[in-house]
Curated annotation (Swiss-Prot):
The alpha/beta-gliadins can be divided into 5 homology classes. Sequence divergence between the classes is due to single base substitutions and to duplications or deletions within or near direct repeats. There are more than a 100 copies of the gene for alpha/beta-gliadin per haploid genome. The lineage of its organism: Eukaryota, Viridiplantae, Streptophyta, Embryophyta, Tracheophyta. Residues 267-278 have a biased composition (Polar residues). Gliadin is the major seed storage protein in wheat. This is Alpha/beta-gliadin A-V. Residues 28-58, 105-125 have a biased composition (Low complexity). Belongs to the gliadin/glutenin family. The keyword rRNA processing does not apply. PANTHER family: ALPHA_BETA-GLIADIN MM1 (PTHR33454:SF7), PROLAMIN PPROL 14P (PTHR33454). Substrate of transglutaminase. Residues 59-71, 81-104 have a biased composition (Pro residues). Residues 28-125, 258-278 are annotated as: Disordered. Keywords: Allergen, Repeat, Seed storage protein, Signal, Storage protein. It comes from the Eukaryota.
Amino acid sequence: MKTFLILALLAIVATTATTAVRVPVPQLQPQNPSQQQPQEQVPLVQQQQFPGQQQQFPPQQPYPQPQPFPSQQPYLQLQPFPQPQPFPPQLPYPQPQSFPPQQPYPQQQPQYLQPQQPISQQQAQQQQQQQQQQQQQQQILQQILQQQLIPCRDVVLQQHNIAHASSQVLQQSTYQLLQQLCCQQLLQIPEQSQCQAIHNVAHAIIMHQQQQQQQEQKQQLQQQQQQQQQLQQQQQQQQQQPSSQVSFQQPQQQYPSSQVSFQPSQLNPQAQGSVQPQQLPQFAEIRNLALQTLPAMCNVYIPPHCSTTIAPFGISGTN
């Protein structure tokens, strides 16, 4: 029994040793199977004692069969991906240009245009109203400028003798104050509007002339009315007196004849606040006087075209 056990242990040890030796051998077979065949035959001759165990190892030769990986070459067939080039058949998408059948929509537009015709008339009325408002605003601005430029007007009147536009002789202190006020107003006006400011000064002087002429005419009318009243009173008194005093009536009858030349219509109230076309030469003269006086006094630049413009700001019948 002991010998049998010893033999069994030896057999077990031999099997383990052979397995430890023979396991790496099949791993080397796929690399160089032609060279390893003679090496395998040598241990088989030495270990013929265990024929039953040697028959198990030959089936390990199928391990090199994993070489069918080259059969993965069909993956190269994935190259047909460039076949998505058939996208060009998407050209039919521009076919939605069939929108031209929507032409009936513009046919409805003339229906809307017809009621819009009265709106154009309303727009014309609105434009006229806007123009009137702008003219009114310009007149208001002109009046404001004239009021602001009254010191400049008085300075020009003091330095130059203008017919029917005489002013009171001012003291030197008041005259210097007027100069300072005039220059302050001119410097506040932007350069683009300074030419209009000079025109407004000339316009204010002409308005001053008209006012003085109207006042003179009113005074003359009042004097004439007083003379008429005096004549009427004298006539009444003479009628009550004896006929011997009738000879004094002849020289006194000359007064009413002179009253015919002065009528209230001569005041021309419609001409107030505007320069008449017949006054343009006078306006040009006064403007030149203002241009000679104000820019040098206030050190203000006035463009050259200001002395050549024909239509001044504020003339009646012009913009």
